[in-house]
């Protein structure tokens, strides 16, 4: 049983299938647009940073800088409190 099988648990290597696709570079939208402060009244912008289930999408996924991510969280929470946005997708 000699060979380069890799041992008992060595299985077939699976192809990830990402060869043809390229990863789009994340960038901070607020920095690009030179926004000074994220406004809670701008609901259309805030909705882009909320998942379908109503959760705030983390900065590691959206590419938002930490400074603006904190402002974004506060703005979304304010908009929810003032009933400009729903807390969940069920409302």
From Swiss-Prot:
Instruction: Report the InterPro entries cross-referenced here.
Output: Ribosomal_bS18, Ribosomal_bS18_sf
Carries keyword rRNA-binding? yes
Q: Is GTP-binding one of the keywords UniProt gives this record?
A: no
Which controlled-vocabulary keywords does the entry list?
Ribonucleoprotein, Ribosomal protein, RNA-binding, rRNA-binding
CC annotations in GO: cytosolic small ribosomal subunit
Entry-linked Gene3D superfamilies: Ribosomal protein S18
GO molecular function term, any single one: small ribosomal subunit rRNA binding
Q: What does this protein do?
A: Binds as a heterodimer with protein bS6 to the central domain of the 16S rRNA, where it helps stabilize the platform of the 30S subunit.
**Subunit notes for this chain?**
Part of the 30S ribosomal subunit. Forms a tight heterodimer with protein bS6.
- HAMAP family per the UniProt record, alphabetical: Ribosomal_bS18
- What does the sequence similarity comment in the record state about its family? Belongs to the bacterial ribosomal protein bS18 family.
Q: What is this protein called?
A: Small ribosomal subunit protein bS18
Q: Which organism is it from?
A: Thiobacillus denitrificans (strain ATCC 25259 / T1)
């Amino acid at each position: 049983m000699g060979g380069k099988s890799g041992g008992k648990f060595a299985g077939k290597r699976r192809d990830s299938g990402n060869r043809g696709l390229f990863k789009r570079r994340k960038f901070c939208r607020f920095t690009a647009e030179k926004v000074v402060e994220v406004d809670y009244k701008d609901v259309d912008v805030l909705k882009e940073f909320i998942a379908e289930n109503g959760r705030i999408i983390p900065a590691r996924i959206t590419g938002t800088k930490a400074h603006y991510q904190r402002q974004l969280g506060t703005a979304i929470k304010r908009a929810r409190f003032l009933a400009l946005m729903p807390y969940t997708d069920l409302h």
